[in-house]
């Protein structure tokens, strides 16, 4: 479970491989393709594995799955 402070800060990670996402062991994860195009997925899903090699930035959201504004 994420600490409230970390949730509010919306920690951002540079992602270079699928293992970078899996090592976080957190979900849901949201991958940013563009400011208006956000795709959500669980780190263990096939969809997440396919997307992670193309995306460079993820935002960790609160455990309820709601995306907080920065």
Swiss-Prot record:
Looking up Pfam families in the UniProt record yields: DUF5432 (PF17497)
**From which domain of life does this come?**
Viruses
Q: Kindly provide the name given to this protein in its UniProt entry.
A: Uncharacterized 8.0 kDa protein
What organism is listed for this UniProt entry?
Vaccinia virus (strain Copenhagen)
Q: What is the lineage of its organism?
A: Viruses, Varidnaviria, Bamfordvirae, Nucleocytoviricota, Pokkesviricetes
